[in-house]
């Protein structure tokens, strides 16, 4: 069937800002699909508000609208752009919900826009809980006893009838938002009230709990002729009851019998046929571990998080092929880009095991509820490939970049009591895997662990094998025991920890078992493949990877977490483009399955590996690159630079010694003094007693900052001795013994610059001004370009300071500098690498900053790039505002008040001719607030309204606000803005606003600006 020639232009809806439940996988899918549609000859119109993505680059689509993903905004764009068709299934739940809203508003019909791919009727049937239940009954597919409810009374009645526990699943939500398991009437009432509020159609499914069953996923592809294939089967390590995004997942399925597998496979294909899916589709099923009974859990009629994992696990480009199907092609007509000889109708085959482990942000939110359930809490994930399940699991653990002690020991970092074991194993948190390994090392019977956790004994037996390998080393670290452990993926660090010796000693003792590299080819070696996609294993003798020659190796940034997000994948991809344009082969090492950088077509060769010295050095030894670039991999790559240099590896760009100088707080303070650059009065300490003395000498309030951390980890403002003790303890743990800077807190305007330098001169594309004052992490502050309140003299001084620092450090490539402006211009931080603002500044200046920085790293000068040293003049009549996006609604009891510790998961961009228009556009997708006219007023709490600064602000703006003491005091059916500066976990305003899906403001400067640019709100 030829492609659809009746249409010429296609609008694609992106997924918007990164948040828990909807992350970088949609940048990967959307980029892949847009490029495929362009290659097919269509005019592609992209609508997305996320500046941090490759998807919103001008090269990805013919027209890019960086605009809010609201019905009003998208309707306006569709009227102006006149697309023939709309493809919404690449934008996650956001894209689907917008497509439904556009249809219900009559926009698609009015503008005669054809919907591509899966129909709206199908989307509705899959997403609407009642409609889906009806379909399953018609297909004779078993589903748990359930009912659809719109109020609490009917839910309680149903639960009483079928018995507790029950599962609450809100309709049309993301990542299980608002859902949960209820064990009694009180829990059901609480969970349901939240779920009904968060569902855009005020609907929830109340379902008999099948927690404890095996959870199985199939990624299915179906074309326009009805040809269907299973792209990938996946099995969750954790049983039903834990969101699949928070579960460890293996591919292919590991524990089903052939009969069980075929039964579930048939069910998945039956459902996709009945729904008339056109493209990619994910189905989740539950298998009773004690019988052949299974149940259908749910389906996703779109590209999903699991699609990205399945694509990377198999090498099969799901989003690209889904886009091809959407324009009329069939699987038998689409070539598999991996083999370039077979067609997409062939089901992929795997001769390896893939493990995905989620990455959580509870290190950022120690007060948040870390228990896992049906609502997703992970911010990102890692993937690893191995010859055995043990090897894949241990490689994935090595990729997580968690606490080094836990990563080395594979156990909690403290003595665990029997009571704690039982609690952690029966009420799982993000640490359950490590408690399991500790329990197995301690000799707990496998059967008891299976009973406590409901995890399939097969998986526990694999963990038991790992524990035995470790016990052997602990008892007698012979070469045989070490080699056996290495073969199954036990890291050198873990072996050294238990053998009580150095990593170097272990490396020497295991040198006779080198890693070899195997290809990911989609066909288990059955056909010849050309994919440059490899993984390491200690099993096997044949190396399938051969040196490219004339290459540069680029370190990726690993899993997405707060402080190190998709922005660094953006810079990595652009670095690769510049390397290739310079005539080198580009090699990427990374382990994040969600990203564009780990698409094998991005680089000349991809190694899907942990970002550790143990895994990097054999790759470097094989490839012999001309150098390694670390500037675009965030703190992950920077932290590896020192060790790489010690091992004789050429690290390109700014020297490692200069990097260490800026990362070490004491050395950097000395540098600023030498250059006569203003800095806050302060000193460095390494322990609590010295901190108390320093605090009394400097005076409160103080800013406490550890060295070598990302995202403001363990940074805090301290006002007295009582607050100092826990903050210093946290900073010592986060910095692993490195100096902690304690300096005077400066209350002023914070701003920052990204700098391009060739070592002698520097170019500054723009100065960014923060709305929130110093003391709020730059990643959480609303950022404005060009600055609105900095005088020309201040801007000149910023340029002078940046130039001084770049020259002194001999910075080559990119650098980010943060300032506070009060009576003087003070430097507060320097990062000699790409920062999270690079995509934002690249979009608003129309300069490929990461590519330019890479060219400088490869030896070019600013002059040869045509860049004039100094500050770039901003474009006239354009204001660009970057606003943070938070996922507090997914992390109950987390602190919400903005502070030096970063909390946001993503960002959105608003652009306009004036500050006001740009502000409204940015707020629409970040705080879901366009103007005060759309709300009924302001709600705050007693602790917040008691603060003098708040009282002064309210009086100056003649505000009448509603003050609440309990969450139930929030006015029903009210569109209001919550405002709080109270960081207690039981804060009623934060809880109520998040439960009601209402805007929540947690910094006084944000509210000040909102009041300054919009009319005063009404009174509730």
From Swiss-Prot:
One of its GO terms (cellular component) is cytoplasm. It is an enzyme of class 6 (ligase). Mg(2+) 3 binds at residue 818. ATP 2 binds at residues 705, 744, 746, 750, 775-778, 818. Mg(2+) 1 binds at residues 284, 298. Its cofactor is Mg(2+); Mn(2+). ATP 1 binds at residues 129, 169, 175-176, 208, 210, 215, 241-243, 284, 298. Residues 928-1020 are annotated as: Allosteric domain. Binds 4 Mg(2+) or Mn(2+) ions per subunit. Pathway: Amino-acid biosynthesis; L-arginine biosynthesis; carbamoyl phosphate from bicarbonate: step 1/1. Its EC number is 6.3.4.16, 6.3.5.5. The large subunit is composed of 2 ATP-grasp domains that are involved in binding the 2 ATP molecules needed for carbamoyl phosphate synthesis. The N-terminal ATP-grasp domain (referred to as the carboxyphosphate synthetic component) catalyzes the ATP-dependent phosphorylation of hydrogencarbonate to carboxyphosphate and the subsequent nucleophilic attack by ammonia to form a carbamate intermediate. Belongs to the CarB family. This is Carbamoyl phosphate synthase arginine-specific large chain. It comes from Lactiplantibacillus plantarum (strain ATCC BAA-793 / NCIMB 8826 / WCFS1) (Lactobacillus plantarum). The lineage of its organism: Bacteria, Bacillati, Bacillota, Bacilli, Lactobacillales. The gene is carB1.
């Amino acid at each position: 069937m030829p492609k659809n020639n009746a249409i010429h232009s296609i609008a694609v809806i992106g997924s918007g800002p990164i948040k828990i439940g909807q992350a970088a996988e949609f940048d990967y899918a959307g980029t892949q699909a847009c490029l495929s549609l362009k290659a097919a000859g269509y005019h592609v119109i992209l609508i997305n508000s996320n500046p941090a993505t490759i998807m919103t680059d001008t090269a990805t689509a013919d027209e890019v609208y960086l605009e809010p993903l609201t019905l009003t905004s998208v309707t306006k764009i569709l009227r102006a752009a006149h697309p023939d068709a709309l493809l919404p299934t690449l934008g996650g739940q956001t894209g689907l919900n917008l497509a439904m809203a556009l249809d219900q508003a009559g926009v698609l019909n009015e503008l005669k826009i054809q919907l591509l791919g899966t129909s709206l009727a199908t989307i509705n049937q899959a997403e609407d809980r009642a409609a889906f239940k009806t379909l399953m009954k018609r297909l004779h597919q078993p589903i748990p006893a359930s009912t659809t409810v719109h109020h609490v009374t009917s839910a309680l009645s149903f639960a009483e009838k079928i018995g507790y526990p029950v599962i609450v699943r809100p309709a049309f939500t993301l990542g299980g938002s608002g859902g949960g398991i209820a064990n009694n009437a009180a829990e059901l009432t609480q969970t349901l009230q939240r779920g009904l509020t968060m569902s855009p159609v005020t609907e929830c499914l109340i379902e008999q709990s099948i927690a404890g069953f095996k959870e199985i996923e199939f990624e299915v592809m179906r074309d326009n002729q009805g040809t269907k294939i299973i792209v990938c089967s996946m099995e969750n390590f954790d049983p039903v009851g834990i969101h699949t995004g928070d579960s460890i997942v293996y591919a292919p399925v590991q524990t089903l019998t052939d009969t069980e597998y075929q039964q579930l496979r048939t069910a998945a294909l039956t459902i996709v046929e009945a729904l008339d899916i056109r493209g990619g589709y994910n189905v989740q099923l539950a298998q009773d571990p004690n019988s052949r009974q299974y149940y259908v859990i749910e389906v996703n009629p779109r590209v999903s998080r699991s699609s990205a994992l399945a694509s990377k696990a198999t090498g099969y480009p799901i989003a690209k092929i889904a886009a091809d199907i959407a324009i009329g092609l069939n699987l038998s007509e689409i070539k598999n880009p991996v083999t370039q000889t077979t067609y997409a109708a062939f089901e992929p085959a795997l001769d390896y095991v893939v493990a995905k482990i989620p990455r959580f942000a509870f290190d950022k939110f120690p007060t948040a509820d870390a228990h896992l359930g049906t609502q997703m809490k992970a911010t990102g994930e890692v993937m690893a490939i191995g010859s055995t399940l043990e090897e894949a699991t241990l490689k994935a653990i090595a990729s997580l970049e968690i606490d080094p002690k836990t990563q080395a020991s594979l156990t909690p970092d403290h003595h665990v009591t029997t009571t704690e074991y039982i609690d952690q194993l029966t009420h799982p948190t993000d640490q359950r895997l490590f408690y399991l390994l500790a329990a197995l090392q301690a000799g707990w019977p496998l059967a008891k662990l299976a009973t406590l956790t409901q995890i399939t004994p097969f998986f526990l037996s694999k963990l038991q094998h790992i524990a035995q390998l470790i016990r052997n080393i602990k008892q007698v670290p012979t070469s045989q025991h070490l080699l056996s452990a290495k073969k199954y993926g036990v890291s050198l660090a873990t072996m050294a920890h238990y053998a009580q010796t150095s990593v170097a000693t272990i490396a020497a003792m295991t040198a006779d078992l080198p890693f070899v590299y195997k290809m990911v080819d989609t066909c288990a070696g059955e056909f010849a493949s050309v994919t440059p996609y490899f993984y390491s294993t200690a099993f096997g003798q044949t190396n399938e990877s051969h040196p490219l020659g004339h290459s540069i190796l680029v370190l990726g940034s690993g899993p997405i977490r707060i402080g190190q997000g998709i922005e660094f994948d953006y810079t990595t991809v652009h670095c690769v483009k510049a390397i290739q344009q310079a005539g080198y082969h580009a090699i990427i090492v990374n382990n994040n399955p969600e990203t564009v950088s780990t698409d094998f077509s991005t680089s000349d060769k991809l190694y899907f590996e942990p970002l550790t010295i143990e895994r990097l050095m054999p790759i470097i030894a094989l490839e012999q690159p001309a150098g390694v670039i670390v500037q675009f991999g965030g703190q992950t790559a920077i932290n590896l630079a020192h060790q790489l240099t010690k091992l004789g590896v050429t690290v390109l760009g700014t020297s490692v010694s200069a990097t260490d100088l800026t990362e070490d707080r004491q050395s950097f303070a000395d540098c600023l003094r030498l250059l006569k650059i203003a800095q806050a009065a302060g000193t460095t300490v390494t322990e609590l007693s010295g901190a108390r003395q320093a605090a009394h000498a400097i005076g409160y309030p103080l800013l406490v900052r550890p060295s070598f951390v990302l995202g403001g980890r363990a940074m805090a403002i301290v006002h007295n001795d009582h607050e100092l003790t826990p903050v210093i303890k946290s900073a010592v743990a986060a910095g692993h013994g490195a100096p902690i800077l304690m300096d005077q807190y400066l209350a002023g305007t914070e701003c920052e610059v990204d700098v391009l330098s060739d070592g002698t001169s520097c170019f500054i594309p723009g100065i960014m001004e923060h709305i929130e004052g110093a003391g709020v992490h730059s990643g959480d502050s609303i950022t404005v370009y060009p600055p609105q309140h900095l005088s020309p003299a201040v801007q000149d001084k910023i340029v002078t300071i940046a130039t001084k620092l770049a020259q002194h450090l001999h910075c080559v490539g990119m650098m980010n500098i943060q300032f506070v402006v009060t009576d003087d211009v003070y430097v507060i931080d320097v990062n000699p690498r790409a920062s999270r603002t690079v995509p934002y500044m690249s979009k608003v200046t129309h300069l490929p900053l990461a590519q330019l920085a890479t060219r400088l790293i490869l030896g070019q000068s600013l002059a040869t790039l045509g860049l004039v040293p100094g500050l770039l003049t901003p474009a006239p009549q354009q204001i660009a505002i970057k606003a943070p996006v938070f996922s507090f609604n997914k992390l109950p009891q987390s602190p919400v008040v903005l502070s030096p510790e970063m909390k946001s998961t993503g960002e959105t961009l608003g652009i306009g001719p004036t500050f006001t228009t740009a502000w409204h556009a940015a707020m629409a997708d970040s705080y879901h607030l366009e103007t005060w006219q759309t709300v009924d007023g302001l709600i705050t709490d007693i602790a917040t309204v008691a603060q003098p600064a708040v009282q002064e602000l309210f009086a100056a703006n003649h505000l009448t606000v509603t003050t609440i003491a309990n969450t139930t005091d929030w006015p029903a059916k009210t569109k209001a803005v919550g405002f709080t500066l109270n960081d207690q976990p039981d804060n009623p305003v934060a809880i109520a606003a998040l439960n009601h899906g209402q805007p929540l403001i947690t910094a006084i400067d944000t509210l000040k600006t909102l009041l300054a640019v919009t009319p005063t709100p009404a009174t509730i």
